[in-house]
Amino acid sequence: GCAMREITKIMKGWEFTGPDGTTTTVDLPHTWNARDGQDGGNDYWRGTCIYRTHFAAPQFNTASHQVWIQFDGVNASAHVVLNGSPVCNHDGGYSTFRANITELLRDENELTVEVDNSKNDRVYPQKADFTFYGGIYRDVSLMVVSKNHFTLDYFGGPGIRITPTVQGTDASVQVTTWHDGEGEVSIELLDAAGNTVATGKGPDITLTIFNAHLWNGVKDPYLYSCKARLVVNGTVEDETTTRFGVRSFKVDPKKGFFLNGKSYPLHGVSRHQDRKGLGNAITREMHDEDMALIKEIGANTIRLAHYQHDQYFYDLCDEVGMVVWAEIPYISEHMPNGRENTISQMKELIIQNYNHPCIVCWGVSNEITISTKDKKDMLDNHRQLNDLCHEMDKTRLTTLACYAMCGPFNRSAHITDMVSWNLYLGWYVPGFILNDLWMGFFHLCFPNRPFGYSEYGAEGMPNLHSTYPHRGDHTEEYQAKYHEYMLRCFKRHPWMWATHVWNMFDFAADARDQGGEPGM
């Protein structure tokens, strides 16, 4: 939030030229695959569609201010044009991007966004068990900001990086800012009640919070905030407020996850961002409802799969104390031409989300060994991503989700700080006991390697029931039996770093036909 910046959303009345070439009027958020991406048959339309809207230039002083446009999520590639001139291109359907449009503005403006979700070999994801809905499915906004402002065009980030470190009962908080134009930076840290707890000046300073109140997971997710102001000749030209949490965590391969020095076993769920009938074009109320349900089942961790989610949802995770695994959609099939895209999506993920206390690890890939031809290039890509994460973020761990069939000795499972497996033992293959054998065997071979379950589950249909449930019957009873076993199994293996059910909610995979339900 910022009083200095004037923000207007551009959500209503866009002209949309769709797959069949006809033009209709739509409001954002919008996807053209809400229906055909959920009805099965693996035939949802992938290609380029055009969104167009007209807007009057906002009031601003051309000598002292600029106008920026921000897109929170356009899947998958966007080509933005204003009044006939190209503004920017963006590859990656899940992250924020911005552009300075001051020079191109007229009194009346025509904004065109060409959105493309067609198959290619450069932009992830291309092969995966979920639908890649095309569209402008998150907010679009205009921002009037002073020429002197915290940086807006560095990988969609906030221009501020906050790194709290617990030191006994206190916390040292390093605040680094970047800005365009001139100005002196002044920093103010506030507690949850809005009282000032520390102040300082400079683009890279370390402040102390005495008797710091820790962000302590679901029990006590306490948040501080940091106000950064850019001051020119005594006038505040730009201001930005960012929430942060003070916490420490570690993973012990023999004892599991620790939060603020105490054992804190992580058991939770994975989440996709789509809804039936709407696809990925969802509302804040739906995010709230998802979180309420996740809290209700007693989860304390969420794997936000398989891509960057809406900022609003990471904020919710901060507020309710969920421990989060955040990841990029480097998935199923390694594409040698896609390396640059994995790097840019990871930079965006980290830079846009660094300040969220909920996030403890960056996931580099998911089931990448399923259909990868060039193993050497794939491993190299993983090493590069792993190094990038450590270089950009000294405070968090790296992880990945491995495909069951790749086995415990696969080299891709030994690059990141931790590893988790997608194992459906007792669902895709018979035998609950296989879970105990898998965990035990891995732990025996690699006692110093943190091990978790990134996916496990059994599909249950609310309309299918049985007194004698068996594997593959899609009954709720079999699903319940499976989860009861798994919870007892995790108790027997308390050293696991985290477990995530696949999935908290139904999601669309147009190629699937599970339990007689095409498309999910």
Residue ranges and their predicted role:
Residues 153-154, 158-162, 227-296, 315, ...:
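N-terminal carbohydrate-binding accessory modules
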Residues 81-87, 190-192, 233, 260:
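Short strand-turn-strand beta-turns centered on an Asx-Gly dipeptide
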Residues 103-108, 176-253:
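Extended acidic/polar, glycine-enriched regions
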Residues 1-3:
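Short, Lys/Arg-enriched N-terminal segments with co-localized hydrophobic residues
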Residues 147-181:
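Surface beta-strand/loop "capping" patches
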Residues 291-294, 301-520:
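Substrate-binding/catalytic cleft of secreted carbohydrate-active enzymes
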Residues 43-50, 61-65, 219-222, 251, ...:
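Aromatic- and glycine-enriched glycan-recognition loops and surfaces
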Residues 6-19, 42, 46-153, 180-182, ...:
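Accessory beta-strand-rich segments of carbohydrate-active enzymes
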